[in-house]
UniProtKB/Swiss-Prot annotation:
Its EC number is 2.7.2.11. This is Glutamate 5-kinase. GO terms for cellular component: cytosol. Keywords: Amino-acid biosynthesis, ATP-binding, Cytoplasm, Kinase, Nucleotide-binding, Proline biosynthesis, Transferase. It is found in: Cytoplasm. One of its GO terms (biological process) is L-proline biosynthetic process. The keyword Ribonucleoprotein does not apply. The keyword Nucleotide-binding applies. It catalyses: L-glutamate + ATP = L-glutamyl 5-phosphate + ADP. Pfam families: AA_kinase, PUA.
Length: 372
């Protein structure tokens, strides 16, 4: 088995907090120097690299003299603001030794949920890569709340991979990779060297939360791989403690767990819809509509809508769920939530008489719909 990284041209590398900090006590300059050296090597063999790096909050805690990660959101935001300065400085310094420029890019979910901002972020990152710059990406923890509380850089790494149409995502952690069970508790646990991303059994194998410094456990990595696979990108989960792990992966050595994308890429527009983490509304659809969407590739008509939940405007991305609450698709709605409630369970021929106008005969056209 050969590493998929060997054939990848554009790679997103996510480095966890434990790999860039001294056990949470500020940044580990020597470790960051090693990451810069390895990425410089990848650049020298023609690969484009985007780095998603944790460590800002840990560095901020060190600079502020805090021993334990705070629970208050405003304190976490303050630590992130202070620590981001140090993180940017050390990366700039270390990459500068190889004549490589870096760029700091801080993102929030709102940046990727809005279509115009999404395209702007994409254009900026692709321009940076074309200029030979290594973008250093992190969540903009200073201005958001839910990302600090529930977010993680594994998910961000997958979103960035999809954003730039990357070939591969490398998630570096302090663990070897994925096991069938927790090897610390189960002596019969077997190592998983390769699997298809999105396989349901993988989520059952994955454990819970991460360290007290970081936020992501193995489950977040499995879900990140599943998300990245929707754009056709393969994911490697490997130990960042392995010597020269990035260089060895690029040389084709099989290290860690490879989660392969089972399908080709979604179109850019559908990828944007699939990557929405927060939706303002959803529609519950009947069994017939579920069948038409999942098997027939049809549009969603108002007559198939049983219930409208949430408040949304025309042009927003909403979820389509079955009677069991499971999301089957999502797409751009042609009608607001108020309008959708009025035309639900009605044939398209009655839309104009009910609303006084007709935007489209479909609630969501199949060209603006993606299965999940």
């Amino acid at each position: 088995m050969q590493s998929v990284i060997a054939q990848a041209k554009r790679i997103v590398v996510k480095v966890g907090s434990s790999l860039v900090t001294n056990d949470g006590k500020g940044l580990d300059y020597d470790a960051i120097a090693r990451w810069a050296a390895q990425i410089a090597k990848l650049r020298s063999i023609g690969k484009e690299v985007v780095l998603v790096s944790s460590g800002a909050i840990a560095e901020g805690m060190q600079r502020l003299g805090w021993v334990r990660r705070p629970r208050e959101i405003h304190e976490l935001q303050a630590a992130a603001a202070v620590g981001q300065m140090g993180l940017a400085q050390v990366y700039e310094s270390q990459f500068g030794r190889y004549g490589i420029r870096t760029a700091q890019v801080l993102l929030t979910h709102a940046d990727l949920a809005d279509r115009e901002r999404y395209l702007n972020a994409r254009s900026t990152l692709l321009t940076l890569l074309s200029l030979g710059v290594v973008p250093i990406i992190n969540e903009n923890d200073t201005v958001v709340t839910d990302e600090i509380k529930f977010g993680d850089n594994d998910t961000l790494g997958a979103l960035v991979t999809n954003l730039i149409e990357g070939d591969a995502l490398v998630i570096l952690t302090d663990q070897r990779g994925l096991y069938t069970a927790d090897p610390r508790k189960d002596p019969n646990a077997e190592f998983v060297d390769e699997a298809l991303a999105g396989t349901p059994e993988l989520e059952q194998m994955a454990g819970g939360a991460g360290t007290s410094i970081g936020r992501g456990g193995m489950l977040t990595k499995i879900l990140a791989a599943k998300r990245a696979a929707k754009s056709g990108a393969h994911t490697t989960i490997a130990s960042g403690r392995e010597a020269n792990v990035l260089e060895r992966l690029a040389a084709g050595e099989a290290i860690g767990t490879q989660l392969l994308a089972p399908t080709g890429r979604l179109t850019a527009r559908k990828q944007w819809m699939a990557d929405h983490l927060q939706l303002r509304g959803r529609v519950v659809i009947d069994a017939g509509a579920v069948e038409k969407l999942t098997s027939g590739g049809k549009s969603l008509l108002p007559i198939g809508v049983v219930e409208v939940q949430g408040e949304f405007a025309r042009g927003e991305v909403i979820a389509c769920v079955g009677a069991d609450g499971r999301e089957v698709a999502r797409g751009i709605t042609n009608y607001s939530s108020a309008e959708a409630r009025l035309i639900a369970r009605k044939p398209s021929s009655e839309i104009e008489s009910v609303l006084g106008h007709l935007n489209e005969p479909e609630l969501i056209h199949r060209d603006n719909l993606v299965l999940v």
